């Protein structure tokens, strides 16, 4: 598993310097030239910074030990044993809670895209300050697969809540890739990326056609659907839940700095020029191999 995932980590640890904004591309193994899942990610952060690389070895922890990642965030109970992991750190004077990437000893890759600007009315209370950076770090320390990464992250969200506006997390191993879109509080949707698909996301929520009946491909925080029905953003009779439309205003979904990247990416990947932001795909099945 470790060797098969090396191409993923090579892409994940791409240099920051020339990026204009964060983007993530996931290529399923059936449409990858290597036969492996490929995760390509660039991390864009402005100002002066260092992009440092580390290896953190596996560790054993004392019973009752806790971890705290931001001064204002919740203390999280630590597990007894944690995995070793490679860590690409965006180091800035004031700290960067949402920029680091990871590749652990189980072959799990973690990368994220900022997806903010949610509806003000949707903000929720969080427990003891909530969790932010801890999601990625604890997944890197604990997850033995991409699917388990989703389980770990969503359990943390259920207990503490997310204090940031929102992000989309990409988790991949040698066999599966998943994306987890997190909205502030405890609102989220998770999608398994199929082997014959490609997914591209810039810095806005892209998940749209959440099939509430497809439990193998999709997972969603159930109370979010209830809230959307109550708010008039979703018809309870419709089994397809348009996640990005529910969580983000139209002006955010149409922002040009994201839309322009979507146009270019999907034209390259599919040969189709999408100009209407409401019609940008979340994923696509393609008939050629990429690498």
Predicted regions located by residue number:
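Gram-negative bacterial Sec-dependent N-terminal signal peptides
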Residues: 2-20
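A contiguous strand-loop segment
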Residues: 22-132, 152-290
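Short, well-ordered beta-strand elements within core beta-sheets of diverse protein domains
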Residues: 136-142
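Short, charged, surface-exposed loops that flank catalytic or proteolytic processing sites
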Residues: 142-148
């Amino acid at each position: 598993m470790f060797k098969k995932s090396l191409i993923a980590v090579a892409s994940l640890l791409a240099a920051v310097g020339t990026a204009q904004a964060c983007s993530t591309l996931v290529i399923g193994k059936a449409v990858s030239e290597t036969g492996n899942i490929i995760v390509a990610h660039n991390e864009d952060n402005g100002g002066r910074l260092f992009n440092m690389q580390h290896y953190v070895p596996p560790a054993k922890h004392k019973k009752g030990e806790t971890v705290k990642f931001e001064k204002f965030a919740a203390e999280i109970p630590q597990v007894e044993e944690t995995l070793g992991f490679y860590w690409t750190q965006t180091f800035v004077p004031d700290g960067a809670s949402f920029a680091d990437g990871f590749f652990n000893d189980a072959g799990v890759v973690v990368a994220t895209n900022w997806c903010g600007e949610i509806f003000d009315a949707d903000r929720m209370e969080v427990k003891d300050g909530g969790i932010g950076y801890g999601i990625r770090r604890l997944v890197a320390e604990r997850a033995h697969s991409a699917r388990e990464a989703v389980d770990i992250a969503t359990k943390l969200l259920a207990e503490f809540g997310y204090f940031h506006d929102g992000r989309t997390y990409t988790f991949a191993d040698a066999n599966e890739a998943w994306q987890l879109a997190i909205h502030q509080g405890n609102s989220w949707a998770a999608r398994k990326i199929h082997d014959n698909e490609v997914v591209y996301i810039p810095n806005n929520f892209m998940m749209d056609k959440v099939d509430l009946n497809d439990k193998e491909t999709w997972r969603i925080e159930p109370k979010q659907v209830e809230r959307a029905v109550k708010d008039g953003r979703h018809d309870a009779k419709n089994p397809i839940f348009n996640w990005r439309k529910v969580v983000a205003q139209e002006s955010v979904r149409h922002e040009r700095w994201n839309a322009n990247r979507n146009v270019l990416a999907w034209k390259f990947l599919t040969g189709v020029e999408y100009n209407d932001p409401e019609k940008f795909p979340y994923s696509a099945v393609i008939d050629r191999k990429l690498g």
